A protein has these predicted regions:
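Short, glycine-rich nucleotide/cofactor-binding loops
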Residues: 100-110
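A short alpha->loop->secondary-structure connector
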Residues: 118-126
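Short internal beta-strands
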Residues: 125-136
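Adenosine-nucleotide cofactor-binding segment
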Residues: 142, 146-172
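Donor/substrate-binding cores of folate-linked one-carbon enzymes
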Residues: 134, 157, 161, 172-294
Length: 294
């Protein structure tokens, strides 16, 4: 009598994630699920969304497969299905950490939070480097044995500084750049070259209080909720597709400085979730919006 494979043995298979968007029509899920079945894959989790406004369909499938299945073989064999449905698709190993670069200026709470979460395995990322236009956090970053890169930025050398960043991204095979309170405005050209690959944390509940000193703007309006917004960076300042938002209730007696203090926590929470979801390939762009399979 042969023993049946245990669940523990099944989970030892290689893990993959397929994400796609395409014009909505009948047969998409059938085509994908049939393909996975015919290639010997097992669906672990599947989420989908059809947007009636844009006419687009979005799908994320987490599946497993035993060797000799490989990611390269899967990509090659899935291409025909992708073409037939005019899909924008990606297929990746789910168990490989995404390589990221963190960028920071003078406020270190988001940087510190991301470094700690990554160090304990709470974020599925590998931090390739931390880049800053100041040297304040070089020692902190060094304590995690992560390379620290000081790239000063002035009006005169901005193009050169961004060229250094792009070179680092390419050399280190970086998939995501995280602006963890990096206070320099990126050029239109850089935003286009890294479109969909830069996440920023803005310290307000967008679309309210854009630009500088949003907590002071919020205080002047007497808000009862303050928030933070993690979004993709575009050439339009603080206008990129929103990924995640977090809020905290405040009373009428709080000062602008107290709002800043409360805001640090919500900034960290919103940014950490956005980075985690991006690294797990749970976010799909839908025009100026996002679809988040959280």
């Amino acid at each position: 009598m042969n023993a049946q494979p245990t669940r523990a043995a099944a989970t030892a298979a290689d893990q993959y994630v397929l994400t796609l968007s395409c014009p909505d029509k009948q047969g998409i899920v059938h085509a994908v699920s049939s393909y996975l079945f015919m290639t010997g894959c097992n669906i672990e989790d599947s989420q989908q969304f059809g947007d009636h406004d844009t006419g687009l369909f979005f799908l994320r499938v987490h599946f497993s497969a035993e060797p000799p299945v490989t990611v390269d073989k899967l990509r090659a064999s899935f291409a025909a299905i992708g073409d037939s449905f005019h899909m924008d698709w990606q297929l990746n190993r789910a168990d490989e950490k995404m390589r990221v670069v963190l960028m920071v200026s003078k406020f270190g709470h988001c940087l510190n939070d991301l470094l700690f979460r990554a160090s304990i395995g709470a974020l599925p990322v590998e931090i390739a480097a931390v880049v800053s236009n100041h040297t304040d956090f070089a020692e902190l970053v060094g304590s995690y044995n992560i390379p620290f890169r000081h790239i000063p930025v002035t009006r005169e050398n901005k193009a050169e500084a961004e060229a250094q960043l792009l070179e680092l991204v390419r050399e280190q095979d970086v998939e995501l750049v995280v602006l963890a309170r990096y206070m320099q405005v990126l050029s239109d050209d850089l935003c286009k070259q890294l479109s969909g690959r830069i996440i920023n944390i803005h310290h307000s509940f967008l679309p309210s209080f854009k630009g500088a000193k949003p907590y002071h703007q919020a205080h002047a309006r007497g808000v009862k909720l303050i928030g933070a917004t993690a979004h993709y960076v575009t050439a339009d300042l603080d206008e990129g597709p929103i990924i995640e938002q977090e809020v905290e209730r405040v009373g009428h007696g709080v000062t602008p400085d107290q709002l800043v203090a409360v805001g640090r926590d919500v900034e960290c929470q919103a940014l950490a979730r956005a980075v985690k979801w991006h690294a797990e390939r749970r976010i799909l762009l839908n025009g100026r919006r996002t679809v988040v399979f959280a």
